[in-house]
């Protein structure tokens, strides 16, 4: 049996769909013989009391979910939405490069820089 922390931001529980998902995660954990507790931002210091961490909030290297994931990883815990994945997925160009290297089929993609953000360039882009 594992003690699992589920990191949740309060804003993520304001939608009925999210609440349903959180309840379903807890039920699934119990059915598999595990204990799942919800952990909020104020509880980040308690994350190391658990065996594993599951992130169920918006992830970005600049928010609390990343701090929670990094804390758990540094303490050798299993983490779903680990810090490296958060960084890769938040950086779309980095993610694109990983997909290309792995030969994952993806739609034609073009990156545009700040200097290309004018009306004429956008019209031309969509006419190609």
Predicted regions, residues:
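A short, charged/proline- and glycine-enriched loop
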Residues: 1-3, 48-49
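Short, charged N-terminal beta->alpha structural module
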Residues: 2-31
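Active-site nucleotide/adenylate-binding loops and adjacent lid/helix of ATP-dependent enzymes
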Residues: 4-8, 74-76, 84-128
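Loop/helix-junction capping segments adjacent to catalytic residues or to phosphate/diphosphate-binding pockets
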Residues: 15-16, 62, 89, 119
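Residues at alpha-helix caps and immediate loop-helix transition turns in enzyme cores, especially N-
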Residues: 17-21, 64-65, 91-92
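Short amphipathic alpha-helical segments and helix-helix/interface helices
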Residues: 22-26, 65-70, 96, 122-123
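Alpha-helical structural signal in soluble globular domains
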Residues: 28-32, 71, 98, 102
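N-terminal glycine-rich "phosphate-gripper" loop used for MgATP/nucleotide binding
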Residues: 34-74, 80-90
